């Protein structure tokens, strides 16, 4: 399929980059799976062990509530693969400082 070949060969960032969950302009709403201004985590599910459902803030001592580089409320170690390589691109790895999985943008 030409579309899949294009994505693999060209790796177009305008299509493949997922917007940050913090890049929203809506009014904060609990449980909408978005991280609007004033929220540290989406507090829709009281069962989330990382997020206080009453305040939408991380529980004391926790670093993150979700993300490809978040495991059990902690940032994954620097260098942990969060997205395997596609085509000629290298693996994307965690920074150890964030729950987000940054695209490295380098060819292998």
Curated annotation (Swiss-Prot):
Cofactor(s) listed:
Zn(2+)
Question: What GO molecular function annotation could you give as one example from this UniProt entry?
Answer: metal ion binding
Please provide one cellular component term from the Gene Ontology annotations of this protein.
plasma membrane
| Domain Disintegrin per the UniProt entry, residue ranges | 27-108
SMART domains under this entry?
DISIN
E.C. number, please? 3.4.24.-
| Protein family | Belongs to the venom metalloproteinase (M12B) family. P-II subfamily. P-IIa sub-subfamily.
Report residue numbers covered by any propeptide.
Answer: 20-35
- Quick one: signal sequence residues? none
InterPro entries xref list? Disintegrin_CS (IPR018358), Disintegrin_dom (IPR001762), Disintegrin_dom_sf (IPR036436)
Q: Which cysteines are joined by disulfide bonds?
A: 41-56, 43-51, 50-73, 64-70, 69-94, 82-101
Question: What would be one Pfam family of this protein?
Answer: Disintegrin
Residue ranges annotated as motif Cell attachment site: 86-88
Q: How does it assemble?
A: Monomeric (disintegrin).
Which BP terms from GO are recorded?
proteolysis
Q: How is the cofactor bound?
A: Binds 1 zinc ion per subunit.
Keywords attached to this entry: Cell adhesion impairing toxin, Disulfide bond, Hemostasis impairing toxin, Hydrolase, Metal-binding, Metalloprotease, Platelet aggregation inhibiting toxin, Protease, Secreted, Toxin, Zinc, Zymogen
Domain Peptidase M12B: where?
A: 1-19
Tissue specificity comment: Expressed by the venom gland.
Protein localization? Secreted
Cite any additional comment in the entry: The disintegrin belongs to the medium disintegrin subfamily.
Record-given protein name: Zinc metalloproteinase/disintegrin
